[in-house]
A protein has these predicted regions:
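Short glycine-enriched loop/turn motifs at secondary-structure junctions
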Residues: 3-4, 63-68, 98
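Conserved short beta-strand elements that form part of the metal-binding/catalytic scaffold
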Residues: 31-65, 113-118
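N-terminal beta-strand motif that seeds the catalytic metal site of vicinal oxygen chelate
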Residues: 1-21, 69-71
Length: 120
């Protein structure tokens, strides 16, 4: 029986960890958490998101801009997030409406699709 979600993983290009940290920690405000010693040599970094984590791994060889795969961050005050991201030059794409939520999406600096979603 599956009892929950432990973590999700996204990827960035090999060697792009500092750019990734800047975007995910400085711009989005997520907290970096320590990776286990056994995984530190593999590149990437981990982020705390509420009571779960997002693992940012490194991987080359594909175009992240062509995939629909994404992660959705549950937020408060969606319009504040939209304004903050636009101030950083990030293009906002309106999401297809779904009942009970407002949302939008954008691409991170590496092409990963990211969604911000708020309950209404």
């Amino acid at each position: 029986m599956i009892i929950g979600l432990h973590h999700a993983q996204i990827t960035i290009p090999k060697g792009a960890e500092e750019r990734g940290r800047h975007f995910y920690c400085d711009i989005l405000g997520l907290e970096e958490i320590e990776k286990p010693d056994s995984l530190k040599g593999r590149g990437g970094f981990w982020l705390q998101v509420g009571d779960r984590s997002v693992h940012v791994g490194t991987e080359d060889g594909f175009d992240r801009r062509t995939t629909k795969a994404h992660i959705a961050y549950l937020v408060e005050n969606l319009s504040d997030w939209k304004n903050a991201l636009e101030q950083h030059g990030i293009q906002i794409l309106e999401g297809v409406p779904i009942p009970g939520f407002d949302r939008f999406e954008f691409r991170d600096p590496f092409g990963n699709r990211v969604e911000m979603i708020q309950e209404v």
